[in-house]
């Protein structure tokens, strides 16, 4: 696993985790600010992304395995008193790492992320049938249906597109999820970790790992995480973009259910999309 380790070794640790399909490059605007403030900033590339190794089988990229890799890194670096910042899948994986090593974390910042536990069991068969019935559409149609969110299952268009599209266009994914656009150089940077199809197992698999169906293997992990965070009294702060249709409302769930969130000031950033690190730095 590749990771950035910037700032003074004795500084208070900040661990920043990216999601799918980005990498540590996403934090290039934030890292210098944190380092200047005296923090030691650790920014891993999740396995399968960035400069980390890229196992070629989608089955290698289970949620549990990715949590384990992050926990192993934190323990090897012996990080203590961590401020965790997680966005997208970085949030889901990192929050579970907090559950597994709670004494190492001092506070949490959740950014455009969540802990979904699937549709109600009574709706599970319908969700599976809906997924089977939807066509594989082009990227633009996928984005439209994702936002439209018919039956509350629009995310399944995203799942199918990532799993089956002949060309998983990573720059398109990032570009279409920010409000302020990307330069040609930035788009090339997001494409660089994936020179051909053999490198894309992780970004293809991650959407399928999101618990939409109640029988998804990650459901027990995230339910256990909710039990933990419903008793979590350390500071828990939400920073969400107001123009992200994917995670809209997830901040309210965190604030309502987590004791440590109820005494904090939270931010909803105006004109900011899913990848708020790009839109708001």
Report residues per predicted region.
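Flexible "cap/lid" subdomain of the alpha/beta-hydrolase fold that forms the substrate-access gate
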Residues: 1, 6, 13, 26, ...
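Short beta-strand element of the alpha/beta-hydrolase
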Residues: 11-18
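Conserved acidic functional residues
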Residues: 19, 88, 278-279
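Active-site pre-Tyr helix/loop in NAD(P)-dependent dehydrogenases
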Residues: 20, 114, 275
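Serine-hydrolase catalytic-loop signature spanning alpha/beta hydrolases and amidase-signature enzymes
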Residues: 21-29, 41
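Conserved alpha/beta-hydrolase
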Residues: 33-55
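Catalytic histidine-centered segment of alpha/beta-hydrolase-like enzymes
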Residues: 272-281
